Each structure stands twice: as structure tokens, then as C-alpha cells.
Amino acid sequence: MANRANRHAARTEDSDNTINYVQCDGLAVMKMVKHCHEESSNMDLAQGALLGLVVDKCLEITNCFPFPKSGDETMDEEMYQLTVMRRLRRVNVDHLHVGWYQSSDVGNSLSMALLESQYHYQTSIEESVVVVYDTQKSSRGFLCLKAYRLTPQAIQMYKDGDFTPEAFRTLKVGYENLFAEIPIVIKNSPLTNIMMSELNELLPEDKGHNFLDLGTATVLENQMRSLIERVDELYQEAVRYNKYQQVVFKQDTEKHRALAKLAAENAVRTSKGEPTVPEEEVIKQFRPMTAPNRLTATITSGQINTHAQHIAQFCSQSLAKLFITESLQIAKEAKETK
């Protein structure tokens, strides 16, 4: 996935103000939704290319097509994309590559693969975005479609290839500012809006039988299970980093002790008129420790934060339904006692 956007010369992005909002055509949304739900039935990650154009500060997505699912390593995915876009151009369809999309499970899309892929896209196609579609949340009746772009700090960090704690502090990068969410709007043609209005009149009225359905059977369970897994991963990263700090502290202590001993020996040599030993002879015995990669821990922290927000939102809605149910039950019992 990381080499799918390498057909353009890489260039550095200096500003995150290239795109102010994303406007997505209704047909493109339907094609993305259809593809993501088809792949979710097989527990696979759906991915595809976004086509459109940039008008002022607006990125218009007018079409899309899925990436091929093939186990053949000899298949040239880049050539496949170029062939599809060339054929779309022949039928007068927008063929400019403006990003990519992928499905999301349990409402969490932040991952190392997403970061790497978007970096290659954004450094080769400046205006590119990644659109994430949450299949699970959308299946409950809430269309969840979000567009993201890497922040300049994240691009600079990934370009330098330095994921040490010092690099994160210098660039002020955290899980909350790895990606910047871009507002996305869905636009339909006037004829489509007229047809939807007519279809809305033909639909039966919702009697609200499922209004108070808590629906906690699978949603909360999946969110909690994923949250526990991410917390375990973050704990392992914390243990690994603590061991690194302990080794560094032990090495520094031994180095200071050796330097102090050398200083005392050099003082004796000086008093005897003998040449002193330079400190470099001691320092080079202690090789600097390689700092652990903190990008994985940062991404895991972002996943934990996302799961916690989803759980809090879901629980607040469920509590509201519980209070409403309690009030209705009390009113019903009071009416029956009369």
C-alpha cells in the first residue's frame, strides 16, 4: 500500500491549508459504502482510490474505484490504477488521483500502515486525503465518513525517520496531532434530491418501536475488547521503554564512576610528572544506547483515546435511554394504579 502513490516526484508539504474541506459526490459515497460492506463480510480491509479535482480550497471527489484483491505478487498495482484512470478519461470521467479510502472496524483507523500510506500519498500528491468509512457504526444507522490529512509536523518527523522521544518533543508531535480531520460534505445533483424527496414520502412512518433499544450486546463488548488489547500493547511498550531508561541510567552511572576514577589517576600521574590519559579513552568504552521507537506507542495511545471516546459516547446515550425508560415506566405504573 505504501508504494501506491510513488508515480509522482516527491515534494515536501509546508502547509496544512491546502484543503479546507472535502466535497464528495453521492455516487462516490455509495460506491465506497458498497465496497467497504462487501469486504467487511469477509473481515478484510477495503481500500480504493479517490478521483476528482481541486477547486480553490475544496477537494471534490467525483468517483472512486477499489484496489484489486489479489495474492499474485507479479501483479503491478500501479499499472492497474493507471489503466483504470486512462479508461475513465476516455469516457470523460474525472481521472485525477486525489487520495484513497479505506474501511474501519470498531471505529478505529489509526495505524502504522495508514500513517505510512498517507505519507507517501501526501508527499507525492499534495492535495491528497484519506477517507475512512466506519462500517460498524454506519450499519447501526449513523453514516460515519471522515477525511484526514497528515499534519506538517507528522510529515517532517516521518521524512526525518527519527521517532525517538527527543524528536517527538522537538516537533511537538502526539497522537492528537498526527492527523488533521478535514470537514467533508456530501453533494447530490438536484435531480437526485428530488428523487430522494419522492422516495421519502413513499416510506412508511417510523413508529419508534426501537427508540429505546439499548443495543449493548455487541457494540460495547467489541469496543471494550479492543480497548483492553490496546492497553496491553501500550503496557508492553511502557515496559520496554522503562528497561531502556534503566539501562541508560546504569550506563551513565558507570561512566561517571569511571571518569571520576580516571580523574583521580590523572591527578596522581600529574604529581609524578607522567602523561595523563584522555577522557575519550573512557568515553569510547560506553557506546550510546539506541533510543526505542516511540511511534508505535504514540499510535497505540491514539487508538486507546478513540476507543475511550466511543465508549463514553455510547454509554451516555444508553444512560439517557435508561432514564427515559424509567420515566415512562413510572408514568405507566401511575396510570395503571388509578
Curated annotation (Swiss-Prot):
Belongs to the eIF-3 subunit H family. PANTHER family: EUKARYOTIC TRANSLATION INITIATION FACTOR 3 -RELATED. This is Eukaryotic translation initiation factor 3 subunit H. It is found in: Cytoplasm. Keywords: Cytoplasm, Initiation factor, Protein biosynthesis. InterPro entries: eIF3h, eIF3h_C, JAMM/MPN+_dom, JAMM_MPN+_peptidase_M67A, MPN. The keyword Lipoprotein does not apply. The gene is eIF3h. Component of the eukaryotic translation initiation factor 3 (eIF-3) complex. The eIF-3 complex interacts with pix. Interacts with mxt. HAMAP family: eIF3h (MF_03007). GO terms for biological process: formation of cytoplasmic translation initiation complex; negative regulation of proteasomal ubiquitin-dependent protein catabolic process; positive regulation of Notch signaling pathway; translational initiation. Residues 22-154 form the MPN domain. GO terms for molecular function: metal-dependent deubiquitinase activity; metallopeptidase activity; translation initiation factor activity. The lineage of its organism: Eukaryota, Metazoa, Ecdysozoa, Arthropoda, Hexapoda. Component of the eukaryotic translation initiation factor 3 (eIF-3) complex, which is involved in protein synthesis of a specialized repertoire of mRNAs and, together with other initiation factors, stimulates binding of mRNA and methionyl-tRNAi to the 40S ribosome. The eIF-3 complex specifically targets and initiates translation of a subset of mRNAs involved in cell proliferation. It holds the Pfam family JAB.
